[in-house]
Amino acid sequence: MSRKDNEVSLARSIFNILSGTFCSRITGIFREIAMATYFGADPIVAAFWLGFRTVFFLRKILGGLILEQAFIPHFEFLRAQSLDRAAFFFRRFSRLIKGSTIIFTLLIEAVLWVVLQYVEEGTYDMILLTMILLPCGIFLMMYNVNGALLHCENKFFGVGLAPVVVNIIWIFFVIAARHSDPRERIIGLSVALVIGFFFEWLITVPGVWKFLLEAKSPPQEHDSVRALLAPLSLGILTSSIFQLNLLSDICLARYVHEIGPLYLMYSLKIYQLPIHLFGFGVFTVLLPAISRCVQREDHERGLKLMKFVLTLTMSVMIIMTAGLLLLALPGVRVLYEHGLFPQSAVYAIVRVLRGYGASIIPMALAPLVSVLFYAQRQYAVPLFIGIGTALANIVLSLVLGRWVLKDVSGISYATSITAWVQLYFLWYYSSKRLPMYSKLLWESIRRSIKVMGTTMLACMITLGLNILTQTTYVIFLNPLTPLAWPLSSITAQAIAFLSESCIFLAFLFGFAKLLRVEDLINLASFEYWRGQRGLLQRQHVMQDTQN
């Protein structure tokens, strides 16, 4: 077993990947503020988001985690035998993905151009924007291929930081074109994003060239990319189901309300932040290590690593869930309630966001559980579970969104329900295949009860202070007391958000220290993230040494 497959290496790698991704997410927040302030909640903006999501459909299907889970294990296997062999395999794989993406994009462009001749005005704008944005998918795929290689080189920070370029170009254009015609500036923004994604890919090129230059001679044995066809095909099917489910949610949101896609997209940006920033980051680091443990039948090490990441992820996501439910309104105000963005849209986004809140924990844990299947090269079970939950989500979204709640928030509540169902079936079938892991999730949930209780206590104290100080209008959609001072300026909104956040976090970590909740105390320890012992563990060691 490689000595890097331990808790220390996992913690350090997680810290590196989170650091780079965090920077890109921060600029993404400013991007959202700029969009809401200067572009408002207009149907043309909703059409832009629908087109933008369609472009990301290609990237989500072929790129990201799906590409990495197929490419990285095979690439590392080849590199262990010969660096030249791995380098030339990467060249072949890169050319295949690049060529396939270009052909696929041209086919979609041709189909959309034909459809464009026969559609009405509202649909015309959506299709036109999609056609302009489609080349972004080519550069996104090239960026993902390069990123997979750089992850093998342990260069997590730079890959996570590259999207900052896109966000900066996005923000600059939105501000520069704020006085232009709404339709013209949306079209111009689409063109600017194509340029932005080109530069995002360009940033990863030097690191790839540096690796390829190390391969000085052609290998004696040439490896075919056919070895990746099976895992890629099943992974693509799994990702396609998820993306089709997301697109169906957006279409259902349009069916429920004309501006429903905008409410859904803006809430998704916030709700997916902890999942993409932390959950998928942990998955990227965990997959290679667990794969080696399962394949070599070193289940003792595998159990330790899984227990470490499940406990860590559970603790973080419990805090994120509570924070989302508590701070949804002040947070959305800071991000969106500016300029042309109406208060009614803010309230609608908050309702959708709170519906998504219950899905944060299962959405973050599901990829980690899926690692147990991927480590055994078994992709069919997650695929069938994904198909089942996607179909259930579509039906439930229609029932809750259109008939029961009669609101876009019904779609988010349906997502939360089906997310827990998906996690249950993933763990059930993974336990059947690897019985030694069967009790691990339950043990992690049981251990997190103390974290959950402490978090709920901090939430109740924070709510109690709002009631006592008659400031419930900061966090309640239907406040108990009227507005004492206006929250129209970004300064007042930021003060309200930061005040609520600081009060909640102060009580949370204060109670954690008082009640000696180690999993919470460790989260605030830099040494813990460096892979060292937690605070309470070090205290126990010191006491034992003194005795």
Swiss-Prot record:
Belongs to the MurJ/MviN family. It is a multi-pass membrane protein. It is found in: Cell inner membrane. The chain crosses the membrane at residues 32-52, 55-75, 96-116, 122-142, 156-176, 186-206, 227-247, 270-290, 308-328, 355-375, 380-400, 408-428, 457-477, 495-515. The keyword Transcription regulation does not apply. Pfam families: MurJ. This is Probable lipid II flippase MurJ. Involved in peptidoglycan biosynthesis. Transports lipid-linked peptidoglycan precursors from the inner to the outer leaflet of the cytoplasmic membrane. The lineage of its organism: Bacteria, Pseudomonadati, Chlamydiota, Chlamydiia, Chlamydiales. It comes from Chlamydia pneumoniae. InterPro entries: Membrane_Transporter-Flippase (IPR052031), MurJ (IPR004268). One of its GO terms (cellular component) is plasma membrane. The gene is murJ.
